[in-house]
Curated annotation (Swiss-Prot):
One record GO biological process: SOS response
PANTHER family: DNA REPLICATION AND REPAIR PROTEIN RECF
Protein's name in the database: DNA replication and repair protein RecF
Primary role: The RecF protein is involved in DNA metabolism; it is required for DNA replication and normal SOS inducibility. RecF binds preferentially to single-stranded, linear DNA. It also seems to bind ATP.
Amino acid sequence: MYVRHLGLRDFRSWAHADLELQPGRTVFIGSNGFGKTNLLEALWYSSTLGSHRVGTDAPLIRAGADRTVVSTIVVNDGRECAVDLEIAAGRANKARLNRSPVRSTREVLGVLRAVLFAPEDLALVRGDPSERRRYLDDLATLRRPAIAAVRADYDKVLRQRTALLKSLSGARHRGDRGALDTLDVWDSRLAEYGAQLMAARIDLVNQLAPEVEKAYQLLAPGSRAASIGYRSSLGAAAAAEVNAGDRDYLEAALLAGLAARRYAELERGVCLVGPHRDDLELWLGEQVAKGFASHGESWSLALSLRLAAYELLRADESDPVLLLDDVFAELDAARRRALAAVAESAEQVLVTAAVLEDIPAGWQARRLFVELRDTDAGRVSELRP
Protein backbone atom coordinates (compact mmCIF):
# COMPACT_ATOMS: atom_id res chain seq x y z
CA MET A 1 0.00 0.00 0.00
CA TYR A 2 1.18 3.51 -0.76
CA VAL A 3 -0.15 7.04 -1.15
CA ARG A 4 0.20 8.21 -4.75
CA HIS A 5 -1.24 11.70 -4.27
CA LEU A 6 -1.83 14.09 -1.38
CA GLY A 7 -3.82 17.27 -1.98
CA LEU A 8 -4.45 19.97 0.63
CA ARG A 9 -6.60 23.08 0.63
CA ASP A 10 -6.31 25.41 3.63
CA PHE A 11 -4.94 22.72 5.94
CA ARG A 12 -3.01 24.28 8.82
CA SER A 13 -0.17 26.30 7.23
CA TRP A 14 -0.79 24.92 3.72
CA ALA A 15 -3.02 27.10 1.56
CA HIS A 16 -2.55 24.71 -1.34
CA ALA A 17 -0.56 21.54 -1.94
CA ASP A 18 -0.56 18.87 -4.64
CA LEU A 19 2.07 16.22 -3.98
CA GLU A 20 2.75 13.29 -6.25
CA LEU A 21 4.24 10.58 -4.08
CA GLN A 22 5.73 7.18 -4.83
CA PRO A 23 6.70 3.94 -3.11
CA GLY A 24 9.95 3.92 -1.17
CA ARG A 25 11.27 6.63 1.12
CA THR A 26 10.47 10.33 0.93
CA VAL A 27 11.93 12.86 3.36
CA PHE A 28 10.37 16.29 3.98
CA ILE A 29 13.09 18.61 5.23
CA GLY A 30 12.44 21.99 6.83
CA SER A 31 13.01 24.06 9.93
CA ASN A 32 10.72 23.61 12.90
CA GLY A 33 7.45 25.47 12.41
CA PHE A 34 7.63 25.41 8.61
CA GLY A 35 4.74 22.94 8.20
CA LYS A 36 6.35 19.62 7.37
CA THR A 37 4.58 17.83 10.23
CA ASN A 38 1.26 19.12 8.88
CA LEU A 39 1.71 16.90 5.82
CA LEU A 40 1.95 13.75 7.93
CA GLU A 41 -0.87 14.98 10.16
CA ALA A 42 -3.11 15.26 7.09
CA LEU A 43 -2.29 11.69 6.08
CA TRP A 44 -2.91 10.44 9.61
CA TYR A 45 -6.25 12.26 9.62
CA SER A 46 -7.16 10.56 6.35
CA SER A 47 -6.31 7.23 7.95
CA THR A 48 -8.00 7.64 11.34
CA LEU A 49 -10.29 10.71 11.07
CA GLY A 50 -8.33 12.27 13.90
CA SER A 51 -5.20 14.28 14.58
CA HIS A 52 -2.30 13.04 16.70
CA ARG A 53 -1.71 16.60 17.93
CA VAL A 54 -5.13 18.03 18.85
CA GLY A 55 -8.42 16.61 20.05
CA THR A 56 -10.71 18.70 17.82
CA ASP A 57 -10.81 19.49 14.11
CA ALA A 58 -10.99 23.30 14.29
CA PRO A 59 -7.19 23.88 14.53
CA LEU A 60 -6.72 21.99 11.26
CA ILE A 61 -8.42 24.76 9.27
CA ARG A 62 -6.02 27.46 8.12
CA ALA A 63 -6.55 30.84 9.79
CA GLY A 64 -9.04 32.88 7.78
CA ALA A 65 -10.57 29.89 5.98
CA ASP A 66 -13.93 28.31 6.78
CA ARG A 67 -13.03 24.78 5.70
CA THR A 68 -10.16 22.52 4.74
CA VAL A 69 -9.98 19.67 2.25
CA VAL A 70 -7.63 16.69 2.46
CA SER A 71 -7.49 14.51 -0.66
CA THR A 72 -5.57 11.27 -1.06
CA ILE A 73 -5.20 8.65 -3.75
CA VAL A 74 -4.15 5.32 -2.24
CA VAL A 75 -2.83 2.38 -4.24
CA ASN A 76 -3.35 -1.09 -2.76
CA ASP A 77 -2.40 -4.19 -4.77
CA GLY A 78 -2.55 -2.14 -7.95
CA ARG A 79 -6.02 -0.72 -7.27
CA GLU A 80 -6.46 3.03 -6.76
CA CYS A 81 -8.94 4.54 -4.31
CA ALA A 82 -9.52 8.29 -3.94
CA VAL A 83 -10.63 9.81 -0.63
CA ASP A 84 -11.68 13.45 -0.18
CA LEU A 85 -12.36 14.78 3.32
CA GLU A 86 -13.88 18.20 3.95
CA ILE A 87 -13.53 19.60 7.46
CA ALA A 88 -15.79 22.60 8.01
CA ALA A 89 -16.04 25.05 10.87
CA GLY A 90 -19.41 24.70 12.59
CA ARG A 91 -20.72 22.09 10.14
CA ALA A 92 -20.61 18.33 9.83
CA ASN A 93 -17.58 16.98 8.02
CA LYS A 94 -18.11 15.43 4.58
CA ALA A 95 -16.35 12.70 2.63
CA ARG A 96 -16.20 11.35 -0.89
CA LEU A 97 -14.99 7.93 -1.93
CA ASN A 98 -13.84 7.68 -5.54
CA ARG A 99 -15.49 11.09 -6.13
CA SER A 100 -18.90 9.89 -4.87
CA PRO A 101 -20.36 11.34 -1.63
CA VAL A 102 -20.77 8.91 1.26
CA ARG A 103 -23.30 9.10 4.07
CA SER A 104 -20.72 9.08 6.85
CA THR A 105 -17.04 9.98 6.95
CA ARG A 106 -16.54 6.64 8.72
CA GLU A 107 -17.03 4.90 5.37
CA VAL A 108 -13.52 5.92 4.28
CA LEU A 109 -11.84 4.23 7.24
CA GLY A 110 -9.62 1.36 6.17
CA VAL A 111 -8.72 2.83 2.78
CA LEU A 112 -5.41 4.21 4.07
CA ARG A 113 -3.77 2.07 6.73
CA ALA A 114 -0.88 3.91 8.34
CA VAL A 115 1.32 3.79 11.41
CA LEU A 116 2.59 7.09 12.78
CA PHE A 117 5.70 7.57 14.91
CA ALA A 118 5.87 11.05 16.47
CA PRO A 119 7.41 12.88 19.45
CA GLU A 120 3.92 12.90 20.99
CA ASP A 121 4.24 9.12 21.39
CA LEU A 122 5.92 9.59 24.77
CA ALA A 123 2.42 10.35 26.04
CA LEU A 124 1.55 6.69 25.41
CA VAL A 125 3.80 5.86 28.36
CA ARG A 126 3.78 9.02 30.46
CA GLY A 127 0.38 10.49 29.63
CA ASP A 128 -3.18 9.95 30.79
CA PRO A 129 -5.11 6.71 30.15
CA SER A 130 -7.04 8.50 27.39
CA GLU A 131 -3.85 8.48 25.27
CA ARG A 132 -3.55 4.72 25.54
CA ARG A 133 -7.26 4.16 24.96
CA ARG A 134 -7.02 6.21 21.77
CA TYR A 135 -4.03 4.15 20.65
CA LEU A 136 -6.05 0.95 21.06
CA ASP A 137 -9.20 2.34 19.46
CA ASP A 138 -7.39 3.84 16.47
CA LEU A 139 -5.58 0.57 15.79
CA ALA A 140 -8.71 -1.54 16.31
CA THR A 141 -10.57 0.70 13.85
CA LEU A 142 -7.80 0.47 11.24
CA ARG A 143 -8.05 -3.31 11.41
CA ARG A 144 -11.86 -3.44 11.67
CA PRO A 145 -13.47 -0.20 10.44
CA ALA A 146 -16.83 -1.26 11.90
CA ILE A 147 -15.39 -0.50 15.35
CA ALA A 148 -15.73 3.20 14.52
CA ALA A 149 -19.52 2.89 14.67
CA VAL A 150 -19.31 1.07 18.00
CA ARG A 151 -17.13 3.86 19.40
CA ALA A 152 -19.55 6.50 18.15
CA ASP A 153 -22.57 4.68 19.62
CA TYR A 154 -20.83 4.23 22.96
CA ASP A 155 -19.74 7.86 23.16
CA LYS A 156 -23.28 9.03 22.36
CA VAL A 157 -24.83 6.82 25.03
CA LEU A 158 -22.17 7.88 27.54
CA ARG A 159 -22.92 11.57 26.98
CA GLN A 160 -26.67 11.06 27.34
CA ARG A 161 -26.36 8.84 30.39
CA THR A 162 -23.99 11.29 32.09
CA ALA A 163 -26.43 14.15 31.45
CA LEU A 164 -29.20 12.05 32.99
CA LEU A 165 -27.08 11.25 36.05
CA LYS A 166 -26.46 14.94 36.64
CA SER A 167 -30.19 15.68 36.47
CA LEU A 168 -31.20 12.72 38.67
CA SER A 169 -29.28 13.35 41.88
CA GLY A 170 -32.33 15.02 43.45
CA ALA A 171 -34.91 12.80 41.75
CA ARG A 172 -33.39 9.70 43.32
CA HIS A 173 -34.11 10.98 46.79
CA ARG A 174 -37.65 11.94 45.77
CA GLY A 175 -38.27 8.38 44.61
CA ASP A 176 -38.83 9.29 40.97
CA ARG A 177 -39.15 5.76 39.60
CA GLY A 178 -39.83 6.96 36.07
CA ALA A 179 -36.51 8.77 35.91
CA LEU A 180 -34.65 5.83 37.42
CA ASP A 181 -36.32 3.45 34.94
CA THR A 182 -34.95 5.65 32.17
CA LEU A 183 -31.50 5.26 33.72
CA ASP A 184 -31.97 1.47 33.59
CA VAL A 185 -32.52 1.73 29.83
CA TRP A 186 -29.32 3.73 29.40
CA ASP A 187 -27.49 1.20 31.58
CA SER A 188 -28.48 -1.56 29.18
CA ARG A 189 -27.33 0.36 26.13
CA LEU A 190 -24.06 1.40 27.78
CA ALA A 191 -23.37 -2.23 28.69
CA GLU A 192 -24.21 -3.43 25.17
CA TYR A 193 -21.92 -1.03 23.32
CA GLY A 194 -19.32 -1.03 26.08
CA ALA A 195 -19.00 -4.82 25.91
CA GLN A 196 -18.44 -4.66 22.15
CA LEU A 197 -15.74 -2.01 22.54
CA MET A 198 -14.05 -3.80 25.42
CA ALA A 199 -14.06 -7.12 23.56
CA ALA A 200 -12.37 -5.49 20.56
CA ARG A 201 -9.75 -3.84 22.77
CA ILE A 202 -9.01 -6.98 24.78
CA ASP A 203 -8.64 -9.09 21.64
CA LEU A 204 -6.25 -6.47 20.29
CA VAL A 205 -4.18 -6.33 23.50
CA ASN A 206 -3.85 -10.12 23.49
CA GLN A 207 -2.45 -9.96 19.94
CA LEU A 208 -0.25 -6.95 20.65
CA ALA A 209 1.37 -8.37 23.79
CA PRO A 210 3.91 -10.73 22.14
CA GLU A 211 4.73 -8.16 19.46
CA VAL A 212 5.42 -5.47 22.08
CA GLU A 213 7.68 -7.85 23.98
CA LYS A 214 9.65 -8.69 20.81
CA ALA A 215 9.92 -5.07 19.69
CA TYR A 216 11.16 -3.91 23.08
CA GLN A 217 13.80 -6.62 23.13
CA LEU A 218 14.94 -5.43 19.70
CA LEU A 219 15.16 -1.81 20.84
CA ALA A 220 16.61 -2.46 24.30
CA PRO A 221 18.40 -5.82 24.31
CA GLY A 222 19.36 -6.99 27.76
CA SER A 223 16.83 -4.72 29.44
CA ARG A 224 13.88 -5.78 31.56
CA ALA A 225 11.11 -7.49 29.61
CA ALA A 226 8.19 -5.34 28.49
CA SER A 227 4.61 -6.50 28.90
CA ILE A 228 1.15 -5.03 28.49
CA GLY A 229 -2.30 -5.80 29.86
CA TYR A 230 -5.85 -4.47 29.81
CA ARG A 231 -7.12 -2.93 33.06
CA SER A 232 -10.86 -2.44 33.25
CA SER A 233 -13.02 -0.37 35.56
CA LEU A 234 -14.66 -3.62 36.71
CA GLY A 235 -11.86 -4.20 39.21
CA ALA A 236 -9.04 -6.66 39.75
CA ALA A 237 -11.33 -9.43 41.00
CA ALA A 238 -12.79 -9.90 37.52
CA ALA A 239 -9.49 -9.46 35.66
CA ALA A 240 -9.12 -13.05 34.45
CA GLU A 241 -12.67 -13.26 33.11
CA VAL A 242 -12.46 -9.79 31.57
CA ASN A 243 -9.21 -10.60 29.76
CA ALA A 244 -10.87 -13.59 28.12
CA GLY A 245 -12.85 -11.01 26.15
CA ASP A 246 -16.20 -12.85 26.09
CA ARG A 247 -18.77 -10.27 25.02
CA ASP A 248 -21.71 -11.79 26.90
CA TYR A 249 -19.70 -11.93 30.11
CA LEU A 250 -18.52 -8.36 29.64
CA GLU A 251 -22.05 -7.08 29.08
CA ALA A 252 -23.32 -8.82 32.22
CA ALA A 253 -20.31 -7.61 34.22
CA LEU A 254 -20.86 -4.02 33.08
CA LEU A 255 -24.53 -4.17 34.09
CA ALA A 256 -23.56 -5.53 37.49
CA GLY A 257 -20.88 -2.88 37.88
CA LEU A 258 -23.29 -0.09 36.99
CA ALA A 259 -25.82 -1.39 39.51
CA ALA A 260 -23.17 -1.62 42.23
CA ARG A 261 -21.93 1.94 41.63
CA ARG A 262 -25.30 3.60 41.06
CA TYR A 263 -25.37 5.40 44.39
CA ALA A 264 -21.88 6.81 43.85
CA GLU A 265 -22.72 7.80 40.28
CA LEU A 266 -25.84 9.66 41.33
CA GLU A 267 -23.96 11.44 44.09
CA ARG A 268 -21.18 12.55 41.73
CA GLY A 269 -23.14 12.92 38.49
CA VAL A 270 -20.58 10.95 36.45
CA CYS A 271 -20.38 7.49 34.92
CA LEU A 272 -17.85 5.45 36.92
CA VAL A 273 -18.03 2.15 35.04
CA GLY A 274 -17.25 1.42 31.40
CA PRO A 275 -14.47 1.32 28.82
CA HIS A 276 -14.10 5.11 28.99
CA ARG A 277 -12.40 4.52 32.36
CA ASP A 278 -10.19 1.61 31.29
CA ASP A 279 -6.45 1.67 30.64
CA LEU A 280 -3.69 -0.14 28.79
CA GLU A 281 -1.16 -1.09 31.45
CA LEU A 282 2.53 -1.03 30.49
CA TRP A 283 5.11 -2.93 32.52
CA LEU A 284 8.88 -3.24 32.57
CA GLY A 285 9.72 -6.34 34.53
CA GLU A 286 7.57 -6.20 37.67
CA GLN A 287 7.28 -2.41 37.62
CA VAL A 288 4.59 -0.21 36.07
CA ALA A 289 6.28 1.90 33.38
CA LYS A 290 4.41 5.14 34.04
CA GLY A 291 6.26 7.15 36.64
CA PHE A 292 9.17 4.70 36.91
CA ALA A 293 10.59 4.18 33.41
CA SER A 294 13.59 6.30 32.43
CA HIS A 295 13.44 8.61 29.43
CA GLY A 296 15.18 6.02 27.26
CA GLU A 297 12.97 3.20 28.51
CA SER A 298 9.86 5.29 27.90
CA TRP A 299 10.94 5.99 24.32
CA SER A 300 11.69 2.32 23.71
CA LEU A 301 8.30 1.30 25.08
CA ALA A 302 6.46 3.92 23.02
CA LEU A 303 8.28 2.80 19.88
CA SER A 304 7.50 -0.82 20.74
CA LEU A 305 3.77 -0.04 20.79
CA ARG A 306 4.01 1.51 17.32
CA LEU A 307 6.19 -1.29 15.95
CA ALA A 308 3.74 -3.86 17.32
CA ALA A 309 0.88 -2.04 15.58
CA TYR A 310 2.87 -2.08 12.34
CA GLU A 311 3.44 -5.84 12.58
CA LEU A 312 -0.25 -6.58 13.22
CA LEU A 313 -1.39 -4.43 10.29
CA ARG A 314 1.27 -5.97 8.10
CA ALA A 315 0.08 -9.47 8.99
CA ASP A 316 -3.53 -8.56 8.16
CA GLU A 317 -2.86 -7.72 4.52
CA SER A 318 -0.52 -5.29 2.73
CA ASP A 319 2.15 -3.18 4.42
CA PRO A 320 0.77 -0.04 6.06
CA VAL A 321 2.30 3.32 5.18
CA LEU A 322 4.94 4.36 7.70
CA LEU A 323 4.83 8.00 8.85
CA LEU A 324 7.91 9.09 10.81
CA ASP A 325 7.58 12.60 12.23
CA ASP A 326 10.91 13.96 13.51
CA VAL A 327 11.51 10.77 15.49
CA PHE A 328 15.08 10.06 14.39
CA ALA A 329 16.22 13.28 16.07
CA GLU A 330 14.77 11.98 19.35
CA LEU A 331 16.52 8.59 19.29
CA ASP A 332 19.97 7.36 20.20
CA ALA A 333 22.05 5.43 17.65
CA ALA A 334 20.78 1.97 18.63
CA ARG A 335 17.12 2.91 18.44
CA ARG A 336 17.71 4.74 15.16
CA ARG A 337 19.18 1.58 13.65
CA ALA A 338 16.30 -0.57 14.89
CA LEU A 339 13.64 1.77 13.50
CA ALA A 340 15.54 2.20 10.23
CA ALA A 341 15.69 -1.59 9.85
CA VAL A 342 11.91 -1.83 10.10
CA ALA A 343 11.49 1.03 7.63
CA GLU A 344 13.76 -0.74 5.13
CA SER A 345 11.09 -3.35 4.46
CA ALA A 346 8.08 -1.00 4.25
CA GLU A 347 6.52 -0.28 0.86
CA GLN A 348 6.28 3.45 1.58
CA VAL A 349 7.93 5.57 4.28
CA LEU A 350 7.26 9.30 4.65
CA VAL A 351 9.65 11.08 6.99
CA THR A 352 10.05 14.61 8.36
CA ALA A 353 13.36 16.02 9.56
CA ALA A 354 14.69 19.45 10.48
CA VAL A 355 18.10 18.72 8.95
CA LEU A 356 19.53 16.00 6.72
CA GLU A 357 21.80 14.83 9.53
CA ASP A 358 18.73 13.52 11.37
CA ILE A 359 18.23 10.87 8.66
CA PRO A 360 20.05 7.51 9.10
CA ALA A 361 23.33 7.33 7.23
CA GLY A 362 23.12 5.57 3.89
CA TRP A 363 19.39 6.02 3.44
CA GLN A 364 18.40 6.43 -0.19
CA ALA A 365 15.38 8.72 -0.19
CA ARG A 366 13.65 11.35 -2.26
CA ARG A 367 14.14 14.74 -0.63
CA LEU A 368 11.54 17.50 -0.61
CA PHE A 369 12.28 20.83 1.08
CA VAL A 370 9.53 22.71 2.93
CA GLU A 371 9.67 26.50 3.22
CA LEU A 372 7.51 29.20 4.79
CA ARG A 373 6.58 32.22 2.68
CA ASP A 374 4.86 35.50 3.57
CA THR A 375 1.79 36.26 1.44
CA ASP A 376 -1.16 38.64 1.57
CA ALA A 377 -3.10 35.81 3.20
CA GLY A 378 -0.44 35.27 5.87
CA ARG A 379 2.47 32.88 6.17
CA VAL A 380 2.00 29.71 4.14
CA SER A 381 4.00 26.53 3.68
CA GLU A 382 5.32 25.63 0.26
CA LEU A 383 7.58 23.04 -1.31
CA ARG A 384 10.75 24.46 -2.78
CA PRO A 385 10.71 24.01 -6.60
